[in-house]
């Protein structure tokens, strides 16, 4: 298991290092680096890591996926990798096959609700949906008369109001106006919107942990290289504390 996890994470890190290093991203103001990065990630099966092979994915473990998310955080990858992984995981809970391409999830806010109407369509408003404008499909958990359902929706059928968060990442509002889903199935017993929120929190926490790890490495390296008064600043007692 540990060997498999190392292979998955090493593959992700190599792709990030080759196609999304800081210098490449900084010099490419138009974001042309994103398309080849996404293609490489897709060819490696990483966006659908948590989807079973039966449903079009790679079928790796949660732990493998967590390692990939930590690596994505270390490289500060601004593509919907985490969102697509989470969407695939959500669809897998109901046995729905995942399509190719970028995905995201809705709702992303615990106060928002998507409702399944009597005619099977979906209605509601979801705020703060990451990368909704870039997504080709959205995985949705909705409440219906018979309990929670999980649905796959064509993003082109939705109205998306694009916004940015403090990190300048897509943080959109998605309006469901009696939208007919591609596929809809009942959620597993005991699985509801709070289940998605909890998993989403884990996903973001792993990305944050990876980013903090990278920040620590950069700070320690800088302190060892930066010289003041003829010695590295890491040697100063104030810095060591």
Briefly describe each language-model feature range:
Residues 13-17, 213, 217-220, 224:
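Structural signal for well-ordered, non-membrane alpha-helices
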Residues 4-8, 29-33, 130, 204-211, ...:
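Short, contiguous, pocket-lining structural segments
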Residues 89, 96-213:
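FAD-binding core of flavoproteins
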Residues 1-78:
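Amphipathic, small/basic residue-rich leader segments at the start of a protein or domain
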Residues 65-68, 72, 87-91, 205, ...:
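Buried hydrophobic packing segments
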Residues 24-32, 189-200, 217-241:
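Glycine-rich cofactor-pocket loops
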Residues 77-94:
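N-terminal glycine-rich flavin-associated loop
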Residues 6, 10, 31-35, 84-88, ...:
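An alpha-helix initiation/capping motif
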């Amino acid at each position: 298991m540990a060997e498999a996890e190392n292979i998955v994470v090493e593959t992700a890190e190599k792709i990030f290092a080759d196609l999304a290093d800081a210098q490449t991203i900084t010099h490419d103001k138009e974001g042309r680096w994103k398309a080849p990065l996404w293609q490489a990630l897709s060819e490696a099966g990483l966006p659908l890591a948590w989807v079973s092979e039966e449903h079009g994915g790679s079928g790796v473990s949660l732990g493998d996926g967590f390692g990939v998310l930590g690596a994505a955080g270390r490289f500060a990858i601004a593509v919907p990798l985490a969102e697509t992984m989470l969407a695939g995981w959500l669809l897998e809970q109901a046995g729905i096959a995942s399509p190719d391409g970028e995905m995201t999830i809705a709702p992303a806010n615990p106060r928002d609700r998507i409702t399944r109407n009597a005619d099977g369509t979906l209605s509601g408003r979801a705020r703060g949906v990451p990368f909704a404008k870039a997504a080709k499909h959205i995985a949705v958990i909705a409440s219906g008369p018979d309990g929670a359902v999980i649905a796959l929706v064509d993003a082109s059928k939705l109205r998306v109001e694009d916004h940015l968060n403090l990190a300048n990442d897509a943080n959109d509002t998605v309006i469901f106006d009696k939208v007919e889903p591609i596929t809809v199935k009942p959620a597993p017993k005991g699985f509801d919107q709070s289940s998605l929120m909890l998993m989403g929190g884990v996903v973001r926490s792993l990305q944050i942990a990876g980013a903090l790890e990278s920040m620590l490495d950069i700070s320690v390296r800088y302190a060892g290289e930066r010289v003041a008064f003829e010695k590295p600043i890491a040697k100063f007692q104030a810095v060591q504390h």
